[in-house]
Amino acid sequence: MKIGVVGLGFVGLSLTSVLSSKGYDTVGIDINKDKCKKISKGISPFFEPELEKILKNGLKKKLKISNDFSLINNCNFLFVTVGTPQNTNGSIDLSIIKKAISTIGESLKKNKKKPIIFVKSTVTPGTMKKIILPILEKKSNKKAGKDFGLISNPEFLQESSAIKDTKFPHVVVLGGYQTKFMKKAKMFFMKLHPNIPIIITNHETAEMIKYANNSFLATKISFIN
């Protein structure tokens, strides 16, 4: 099995490092060439406890870091972890994820493995169906549910415990259609995280769960301050 992670920020690099350290054939992709060179040397572009240790362990195994998107052409699983920053008016800027999804859609044309695409980036409810799914189908000329799977897989990491949260999440949320792809995804996470509860729901609910979690954390932080 080959796994690709698109976007090597806080979430993406933590996920890439953990997956590769567990022995998965993993490729981490980022458009920033300088960042990729740094990570390839085992140096994290930001501080996170245990991250560099896990990263170096992965690099000794099957981990590859690159800005070459063609490396995801033959992946079985693809995790999208690019940033979705806020605009000045409080709305989410989807320009980065749209560009990443367009590139992934192009790669689907050459991918004969019927991959599953997991979107971990924070997006507003409805984004998967109204924006991401149409882009993927248009660029790839393939159909979701038949030629590839598309699943919302929100993350719940916190700074200073990202590696721990990636290794031992309190829950795994999978949002999407009840197809063979969902069954395959569930089996993967059951193996990756034994004894961790898995919630299977639709895209919108998975997106909303992420937003509710973010709101809870923001409220918690405000009380601490």
Model regions and ranges:
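Short, glycine/charged-enriched secondary-structure capping and boundary segments
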Residues: 19, 41-44, 92-96, 131-134, ...
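Internal alpha-helical scaffold of NAD(P)-dependent oxidoreductase catalytic cores
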Residues: 134-151, 157-225
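Conserved N-terminal Rossmann-fold NAD(P) cofactor-binding segment
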Residues: 25, 31-77, 83-91, 135-142
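NAD(P)+-binding Rossmann beta1-loop-alpha1 motif at the extreme N-terminus of oxidoreductases
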Residues: 1-43
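Glycine-rich, N-terminal phosphate-binding loop of Rossmann-like dinucleotide-binding domains
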Residues: 80-83, 121, 176
